[in-house]
Swiss-Prot record:
Organism whose genome encodes this protein: Escherichia coli (strain K12)
Regulation of catalytic or functional activity: The enzyme has distinct binding sites for each of the allosteric effectors such as acetyl-CoA, fructose 1,6-bisphosphate, guanosine 3'-diphosphate 5'-diphosphate, long chain fatty acids, and L-aspartate.
EC category: lyase
Active-site positions on this chain: 138, 546
Lineage, broadest ranks: Bacteria, Pseudomonadati, Pseudomonadota, Gammaproteobacteria, Enterobacterales
The protein's name in its UniProt record: Phosphoenolpyruvate carboxylase
Amino acid sequence: MNEQYSALRSNVSMLGKVLGETIKDALGEHILERVETIRKLSKSSRAGNDANRQELLTTLQNLSNDELLPVARAFSQFLNLANTAEQYHSISPKGEAASNPEVIARTLRKLKNQPELSEDTIKKAVESLSLELVLTAHPTEITRRTLIHKMVEVNACLKQLDNKDIADYEHNQLMRRLRQLIAQSWHTDEIRKLRPSPVDEAKWGFAVVENSLWQGVPNYLRELNEQLEENLGYKLPVEFVPVRFTSWMGGDRDGNPNVTADITRHVLLLSRWKATDLFLKDIQVLVSELSMVEATPELLALVGEEGAAEPYRYLMKNLRSRLMATQAWLEARLKGEELPKPEGLLTQNEELWEPLYACYQSLQACGMGIIANGDLLDTLRRVKCFGVPLVRIDIRQESTRHTEALGELTRYLGIGDYESWSEADKQAFLIRELNSKRPLLPRNWQPSAETREVLDTCQVIAEAPQGSIAAYVISMAKTPSDVLAVHLLLKEAGIGFAMPVAPLFETLDDLNNANDVMTQLLNIDWYRGLIQGKQMVMIGYSDSAKDAGVMAASWAQYQAQDALIKTCEKAGIELTLFHGRGGSIGRGGAPAHAALLSQPPGSLKGGLRVTEQGEMIRFKYGLPEITVSSLSLYTGAILEANLLPPPEPKESWRRIMDELSVISCDVYRGYVRENKDFVPYFRSATPEQELGKLPLGSRPAKRRPTGGVESLRAIPWIFAWTQNRLMLPAWLGAGTALQKVVEDGKQSELEAMCRDWPFFSTRLGMLEMVFAKADLWLAEYYDQRLVDKALWPLGKELRNLQEEDIKVVLAIANDSHLMADLPWIAESIQLRNIYTDPLNVLQAELLHRSRQAEKEGQEPDPRVEQALMVTIAGIAAGMRNTG
């Protein structure tokens, strides 16, 4: 562990030195000295030197407007470099994640040692593995794509520098390259000038596939196969690829008017274009590699006389021609040209799979297994994982949009107003229409633009090649009619298959009602016939936490899942729970392994489907090696959760959780909803209003342009509190509730829950992580600089509350200090704090200057505005999660 820290620290300091030289070359000695002074003061302030802390505040307050941007950029870029070094160390031979592929081996050994599990049972669990990662374009991926590419190359340089046998001239060359990359980053604007469009976001997603997943997935499968052979003597079948990728980019229209039916159609074409592009590169390699002559009679029959001389090449060249024709047609469609479909257009995965698999079988049969299991096997696995669509997309829309569309239709038809009908009447109407053979939509009807958009989206789904759209997610789902309404709209669009429609339950009340809603649906014969024994339900983490606080939300999520699992099991339905987690704790983010093992028993039987959000995509899948490591972690966790499920909680533990939930929700809502000072305090103590100006993501920050905290999306809500280091949404209410239960004499019971119930210990672990990242002296400084004195008592009250919360969590967990069991994470937070603290102090100063100017009716100073954006991005990098 210590070797790991020292290697990380020495790389961080080397990168910092190079950045310093870059700053000196660009701006002169004076700015570098200023930055160095601030860094030293910050380090000493962190070590507890109050005089230096005061000096740090004064130095940053006294910066001229010309010095603001260079200082903000220096610390922000430093944090990006530190994150890159940390990412490298997590996969370097000395690092923590280098052992992550080992996770699979460790899991398999652990499972083999359980007397009640036979090897056959373990094999069956492997064969039923299913992992679907849903990439979402959260506005929280602050870092621009161009800087991400440079950081990937910095990572490659660090890797080569670690090589012991490197010659001096090679070392010098690598150092020169590092200097170039860091200089390029310094001279690149780190803040986007324009908001990305939904198409830009989709392209960002394709870049992740191309730069990392394309290589990472086959590498992960080789690793998995190796561990299975070694531990179970079991070989993965060629066609077995347990991992799929889906995307919300270009499909998620919930609250985002920029995602239209036309955009979705465009993104679907673009995704197919990118797939042909990547497969063409693969096939080109195979054309040059597969020069073999010997082949089975089956393969020779397939290629005929024409291809007999080089049968494998012949098939590959044919496939190449089809890919090129497909790509040309897609390009024309993307330019808006309407062309007839060419001969040999690829629309289904089988068309790619069959010629490749024929070559594979022939090579195996002719004793050339070593060749078959090379690049050809990787390409076959890519066909199974990515296929013709590259990534499938989910469509997501808010339930009220469907209700409004049907209301407009029924009013036009003169049969009443669907929107005002009771739930029973809605269901009766929907089931009648779903069973009817005649169309419901009149030909000459001219609906409003909003309704037209809903209908056009259903049209896009009906026209898309089957298999390119994964599911239709209904956000803010509350009733069975919300689900039936979507099925009716899809039927009217002429969809010819049963599209998975997943209700998303995301407020506290909706989570509590989820099981009733699904029970009612499953009791409808028509519905049971449609779903063919499979149901997907999405659990919302971020909105429930914003609605009720993190403790009440996590218990409601647990109970909703638990009840749904039991209901579906009884009804013989295979349930897939789809988890809408975010990267930050307030949005359900927890280290994957811990989070999965803390779910109710049986929650992963139908596989794992989970959203991977903006900034977390880069931390978990930014490089092929990290992809292998992340997928291995998920695999180990799913196998363990399915074969060694966590215990059912005792009744007394459930009662304690009910109690904690009620108390914490009351405390949370008492502040957030009922305290009249809370919203003005939130608006002034955090950069919430300024965040709206950042060109982040294509989605507006509010669901409705007016309205208070409740209309704010969960992401900006959490983002804002992360910036001022109070981290309030991730803990408010939880500690107070724990304290109350301790005072009722139940501390020993809480300690037992912490020891023996993964759900509860994960909750406490997440609280510790939040407290480790929070900083009360900084939160207090924001108050002093930005908040009206009349509101100071509220800030003080919240900070005192956090101090009390930390004590009670440590007492229950029996820890002397925060993160005692995860020293690597604690070390990484400490390392970054030295660079994040000055950005926080500077941000408070910039907010003060910007608001002062606004108050005095002056135009905003572009230097202040730009520096403010940089501090927001820098603190997000320092906290390693944004919203």
